[in-house]
Structures are given as C-alpha cells and as structure tokens.
C-alpha cells in the first residue's frame, strides 16, 4: 500500500533537514545538490520577511508523484505516474504548529513547482492574514466590484467571483460569500506576487484575466503590506532604482 501523506508527514517530520527560518525538507525523490537551490533556497529566500513571520513551521517533501484515487480518497505518494485525473501536483497536511507540504516533482518544470509551492503558502496566509491586510484587501475588492471589473488572477478566485456576480449588486460586497471570495482572491494574487519576486514570470493574458491596471494596483497593495526582501524586486523598474543606489 502506498503511504498516505498524513502517515508520511508524521514519520518524516523528525527526519527533515533544516533549510533556514521555519523551513525544513525531505527528499522522497532524489534531487541533485545543485538543483536544491532552485527547489528550496531561492523560493524561500525570496519570501518577504512579513510573510515568513505569518507562516507556521513548514516541512517540504519533494515526492515523485502524488495520487488521489478518488475525490474523497486520501492523497498518497507513489513512484509510478498516475493517470492525469488522479495526479495531484501539491497537497498539505496541517499538524497544528507545523504544516507539511507535498509536491509532485518528477517530470515537472521547476517553475511549475514554484507556482504550487507559493499557492500552498498563500492559501495558508489567507487563513492567517492580519486584520490590516484583510481590511485593505476587502476595500480594494469592493472598489473593483463597484467598477464592475471583470476577470481574476486564477481559476479558483474566478469561479468564486462569478458566483458573487450572480447576486444582486447590493449583496455582493459583504457576507460569507464575499469573504470567501476575498480570501481566495488574496491567495491567488499573493501566489502571483510571491512567484514574481522569486522568478521572472509572464502573466498570461486572456478573457478571464484581471485587467493589467487592476492587477498592478493589487500587486502595489501587497508590496506595501508585505515588502520584498532586500535585493528582490516586484516590478521591473524596482530593479533599475536598486542599481542606481549602488
């Protein structure tokens, strides 16, 4: 029987190697020493200090493949590639003061792994965000909804936004559905924000994508709330300013 991630998280916790701050890792899939930097050090060092403070202790398990055999079944670590419908790219186990994150890494691009890593971390942040950040984010979304701005940053928030837009205008800007949408849109935008600080990424444009002007406003808000670490930039022009100072 392949081991479930719940079982593995308990077994592997004491065997993990620290990688700075709150992070530790375990390799279920061999990774070359020179590649570890891309998998672990680079994305962790790119985290804003205020983000790192909010996170619990994090264990990262790089696995060959993750499989969920049915929607209700537990996620397991497997060494043979599952069918596409069963393949999971990331999963998490919340152990109270520590969270263990599992990732499919075989045949996966490092940039895709970074996306799933930041998606998992941003989802954790959305349940731990400080009141100041939540209030500022919700105020910005209310402005977007008033201006009838279409599109979102990623699929999950896009679907929640569509459900919200089916409600009468007066009922869109508060209540449980709005708060659920706000948390997910924060997580999805935060994923993009963190990924952008770490790596040179392209934002896909499409009919579902939030217009550039509004995306920029969101990223500027996140930059103000969670400034990037020294030597890292959010926008291309941040880098030029950085060079001028030296």
Residue ranges and their predicted role:
Residues 35, 39-42, 136, 140, ...:
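Exposed alpha-helical structural elements
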Residues 111, 115, 126-164, 202-209:
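Post-HEXXH active-site segment of zinc metalloproteases
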Residues 143-178, 183-192:
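An amphipathic alpha-helical core segment
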Residues 122-131, 192, 196:
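Alpha-helix capping at helix-to-loop junctions
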Residues 1-17, 171-246:
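Pan-zinc metallopeptidase signature
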Residues 1-112, 226-245:
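A metal-dependent hydrolase signature that marks the N-terminal structural subdomain at the beginning
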Residues 107-119, 123-124, 180, 184:
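Active-site alpha-helix of zinc metalloproteases
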């Amino acid at each position: 029987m392949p081991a479930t991630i719940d079982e593995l998280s308990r077994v592997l916790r004491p065997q993990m190697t620290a990688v700075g701050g709150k992070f530790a890792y375990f390799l279920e899939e061999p990774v070359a020493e020179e590649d570890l930097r891309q998998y672990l050090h680079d994305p962790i060092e790119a985290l804003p200090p205020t983000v790192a403070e909010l996170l619990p202790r994090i264990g990262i398990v790089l696995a060959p493949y993750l499989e969920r055999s049915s929607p209700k079944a537990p996620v397991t670590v497997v060494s043979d590639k599952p069918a596409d419908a069963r393949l999971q790219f990331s999963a998490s186990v919340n152990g109270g003061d520590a969270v263990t994150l599992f990732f499919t890494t075989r045949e996966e691009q490092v940039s895709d792994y970074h996306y799933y890593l930041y998606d998992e971390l941003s989802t954790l942040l959305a349940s731990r965000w400080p009141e100041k950040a939540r209030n500022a984010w919700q105020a910005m979304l209310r402005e977007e909804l008033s201006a009838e701005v279409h599109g979102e940053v990623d699929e999950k928030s896009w679907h929640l936004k569509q459900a919200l837009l089916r409600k009468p205008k007066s009922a869109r800007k508060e209540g449980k559905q709005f708060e659920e949408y706000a948390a997910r849109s924060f997580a999805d935008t935060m994923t993009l924000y963190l990924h952008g600080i770490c790596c040179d990424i392209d934002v896909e444009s499409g009919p579902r994508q939030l217009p550039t002007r509004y995306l920029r406003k969101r990223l500027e808000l996140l930059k103000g709330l969670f400034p990037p670490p020294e030597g890292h930039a959010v926008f291309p022009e941040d880098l030029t300013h950085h060079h001028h100072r030296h």
